[in-house]
């Protein structure tokens, strides 16, 4: 049940989200969007819930405390002004306290947050395409896919993406994942991965 009336943010709002549960690359995609906006002369501000963080109300991130804000939040804050909080309306209002010309809000994982209206919505996907998936718990869909989105971002170097037509005529953009190997000593190491779908890391 929706408890609040949806409102427009004081600035243009771009949402990066997904229909499926688990890691689909939302955070790096949101960071990329913010980087492109910055290159074009805009002042991006990240809005993020702060998964696993302990902060209860919307807060402008001012430290690298992953316990308080969540690790994804701290990653964003290294590059752009970031506001963490479950209440996206409150976070959007708080953005007025941040400096910058031509502000644009970038929501990391905001597709299921209906209280804040979006001007442009991007859906990330990988592996099993969302239109072929099923609702939880049988599949990984968080909600029934709808056409109230503006673009689909797909990881190209997953099997089958090269020859699949875009869903419902919505523009689809593909990208290739680049694996970067860091050279160093030949000592054994330990890899720790905290994403939902660790196959890419492994």
Model regions and ranges:
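Redox- and metal-dependent alpha/beta enzyme cores, enriched for Fe-S-associated oxidoreductases
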Residues: 178-202
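Walker A (P-loop) phosphate-binding motif
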Residues: 2-62
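Short beta-strand/turn micro-motifs composed of small residues
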Residues: 17, 48, 125, 153-156, ...
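GTPase G-domain guanine-specificity segment
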Residues: 161-167, 196, 200-201
């Amino acid at each position: 049940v929706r408890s609040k009336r949806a409102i427009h943010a004081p600035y243009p709002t771009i949402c990066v989200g997904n229909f499926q549960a688990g890691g689909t690359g939302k955070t790096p995609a949101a960071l990329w969007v913010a980087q492109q906006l910055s290159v074009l002369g805009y002042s991006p501000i990240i809005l993020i819930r702060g998964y696993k963080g302990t902060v209860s109300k919307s807060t402008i991130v001012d430290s690298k405390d992953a316990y308080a804000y969540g690790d994804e939040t701290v990653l964003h804050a290294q590059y752009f002004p970031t506001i963490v909080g479950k209440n996206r309306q409150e976070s959007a209002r708080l953005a007025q306290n941040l400096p910058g010309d031509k502000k644009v809000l970038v929501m990391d994982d905001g597709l299921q947050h209906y209280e804040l209206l979006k001007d442009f919505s991007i859906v990330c996907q990988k592996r099993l395409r969302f239109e072929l998936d099923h609702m939880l718990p049988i599949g990984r869909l968080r909600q029934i896919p709808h056409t109230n989105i503006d673009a689909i971002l797909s990881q190209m170097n997953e099997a089958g993406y090269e020859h699949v037509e875009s869903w419902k005529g919505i523009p689809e953009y593909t990208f290739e994942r680049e694996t970067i190997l860091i050279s160093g000593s030949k000592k054994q190491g330990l890899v720790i991965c905290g994403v939902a779908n660790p196959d890419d890391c492994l």
